[in-house]
Amino acid sequence: MRKIKIITDSTAGLTLEEAAKWNIEVLYLTVEIDGKVYNPKTDITPEEFMVRMAETKELPKSSQPAIGSFVEAYEKYTAEGYEILSIHLTEKLSGTVNAARQAADMVEGNITVVDCDYTARGQAFQVLKAAEMAQAGDYSVEEIHAAINDIRDKTKLYIVVVTLDNLIKGGRVGRMQGFLGSLLNIKLIAKLTDGQLEEETKVRSNKKVLQYCLNLIKDEPKKIQQLDVVHANGLNLADDFIAESKEITGLTEIPLFFADPVISTHAGTGAFAFMYYTD
């Protein structure tokens, strides 16, 4: 039986139960609010983070795990006889995967580092598939890598930003453009493509957001195998989207998750995202 350890980072949004069930090692990105650093695993819940973020004038800062954290994890599991498959969010959004690559070069053993091209549950799709195959003990790292690449190629991720405040604070939207967008009640819908967030469209009401997003589901030519929803205090949109998506897709379960603080930092209050993969 092969011993393969799956390692990922916290932006995948795995629950503690998922990580425990599938024996996945999660390395945490941290967030800094008003000079204080928080580890989302031990120091602050996603809900508490949203409250703190609303209270601060400055955009919280996120930091990738230190290279030393990767080295420590890689040394631990290679010493126990594991091969390692380390799956991380797109390098277009964070330097996490590059830190993992540097650490892998410093540790002897069979360590494969993967840029999954996604984040949030789009990343989790690949991580959970890898962990399921690793736990079976019948597959090589190469076979698992090929399987998650297949899921990657069949995945789509969309995010709805209902307030431009955090994008303005982060310098991603000009202040005048953001001010006008707020006046016009503009909601931004973006798509993650090849690891890069790109504008899909802009609409002017939550009703039009819901209509547009549901049309994306309706117009998907292939059968949707898994559809997950993530929100940052965006339950109104998320709940309506889930209810109607069940009717469209025939899926009986569409899981809903609270966004990881790193994701919420950039998406802002009220955001929600949905991601799926097809057959």
Swiss-Prot record:
Binding site for hexadecanoate: S62, S94
Keyword annotations of the record: Lipid-binding
DegV domain ranges (all copies): 4-278
InterPro entries xrefs: DegV, DegV_C, DegV_domain_contain
Any matching Pfam family: DegV
Keyword Signal: no
GO MF annotations, alphabetized: lipid binding
PROSITE patterns: DEGV (PS51482)
Function: May bind long-chain fatty acids, such as palmitate, and may play a role in lipid transport or fatty acid metabolism.
Protein name (record): DegV domain-containing protein lin1977
Natural source organism: Listeria innocua serovar 6a (strain ATCC BAA-680 / CLIP 11262)
